[in-house]
Design a protein with these regions (language model features):
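Short, well-structured N-terminal submotif of metal-dependent ribonuclease cores
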Residues: 1-38, 51-66, 109, 118-119, ...
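Generic structural signal for small/hydrophobic residues in well-ordered secondary structure
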Residues: 6-7, 45, 86, 106
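Short secondary-structure boundary/hinge segments and terminal tails
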Residues: 46, 66, 85-86, 123-125
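Active-site neighborhoods of divalent-metal-dependent phosphate/nucleic-acid chemistry enzymes
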Residues: 55-61, 69-118
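Basic, glycine-rich
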Residues: 128-130
């Protein structure tokens, strides 16, 4: 199974947060599972750090490199098909551009999105894994 980690799931997984549920943690740790993250999430983390809303265990650039290695993550490129899909998603879906891009990428590339975001979990047009279960 291929998983696209939502921004908060990436943070929780690397920082060892107990918010990440047992079922999700097990699913992501299966050796054959592919774990992907988007540069959109890096942008969101950078915004949170810049606003002082979160503190990371090291500077952001180092954090990204360390987490990619430790969690065996791959980057999913932001492609034209996903960008188009972000604004042609089956409705209803909310207007957050980052969520739209993540959901679109998951749909276009056949990924399951690991998230605790209730708006994404309740959206019936993308495969998801509840991050807090």
């Amino acid at each position: 199974v291929k998983y696209l980690l939502d921004t908060h799931v990436w943070i929780w997984a690397f920082e060892g947060s107990n918010r990440l549920g047992t079922k999700c943690r097990k699913a992501l740790s299966v050796p054959s599972a592919e774990r992907l993250v988007s540069p959109v999430s890096t942008m969101e983390i950078a915004r949170l750090v810049a606003r002082g809303e979160i503190e990371l265990s090291c500077p952001l650039q180092e954090w990204v490199a360390r987490s990619m290695t430790a969690l065996k993550l791959r980057t999913i490129e932001l492609d034209h098909a996903s960008a188009i899909e972000a604004y042609t998603l089956p409705q209803p879906f909310h207007q957050d551009p980052a969520d739209r891009l993540l959901v679109a990428a998951a749909r276009v590339h056949g990924l399951r999105i690991a998230t605790a975001d209730s708006r994404i979990l309740q959206y019936g047009s993308v495969a998801s894994l509840h991050a807090q279960k």
